[in-house]
Amino acid sequence: MADQRPLMTWLEANNYESFLQEDIFSFLDQSLFVDPHSSFIDPFKDFQTQNWFSLQDSIVNHISTTFAADHTFLASLDLEAISSTFSLDISSGWWNENNGNYNNQVEPNLDEISRTNTMGDPNMEQILHEDVNTMKEKTSQKRIIMKRRYREDGVINNMSREMMKQYFYMPITKAAKELNIGVTLLKKRCRELGIPRWPHRKLTSLNALIANLKDLLGNTKGRTPKSKLRNALELLEMEKKMIEEVPDLEFGDKTKRLRQACFKAKYKRRRLFSSSS
């Protein structure tokens, strides 16, 4: 025991009191006791002697007997299966090395998460359903608009001035509807063809004047010569044809006066009818 004193002094000098209190190395009291007359005084002198290996066996056997409980615990487990499949985590969970997941769980994708979050919530399901319907409606509307624009562009590009003449006697909105195009595109095509304004009002006014003169021509009793009325009718018919060819043409002075005279005649006729009744 006198040989163990330097060892105890060295351990105390290095502050190993906590380990000595636990008495973990108590098994070294017997295993390191060596006879001074034996060959262990110089172990490196005969490194492969029986005494050296017997000393190793005694230390290892003593350690194995001391920690027998640990070996028993490890032996009860299938180490090969654990190393190949699972490893124990610090937080008492299992990590699967094959699929790289914790506790052998399969992580859901984003679609499954979104469906799981919306399950049981009728408001969220209704909102998602409305959003999908809105997206479909917008997509269908865009397709309809693109098809209509493509068709309208084809119709407008093929439209000439001669084709538009037959639509001059109707309002521009009705003409666009008849042509199955938009009013804006029709106005644009008119400007491209040199028609700054739609001549519907001018032609309608001329048709009204012609109708009034025909009535006067049938009801005259010698106060107005019929020859003058016929000349006026010819003048209006000529001007109507000129406006069809040149829609931007303004009325002449004779046409303006004739229009004022017709207005006065209609006014007098109304006064007579109202007074007689």
From Swiss-Prot:
Cysteine-cysteine disulfides: none
Record's subcellular location: Nucleus
GO CC entries: nucleus
Broad class of where this protein is predominantly found: nucleus
Residue ranges the record marks as coiled coil: 201-246
Source domain of life: Eukaryota
Domain RWP-RK: 142-226
Cross-referenced PROSITE patterns: RWP_RK
MF annotations from Gene Ontology: DNA binding; DNA-binding transcription factor activity
Entry keywords, A to Z: Coiled coil, DNA-binding, Nucleus, Transcription, Transcription regulation
Pfam families per UniProt: RWP-RK
Function: Putative transcription factor.
PANTHER family, per the entry: PROTEIN RKD3, PROTEIN RKD4
Record's protein name: Protein RKD3
Gene encoding the protein: RKD3
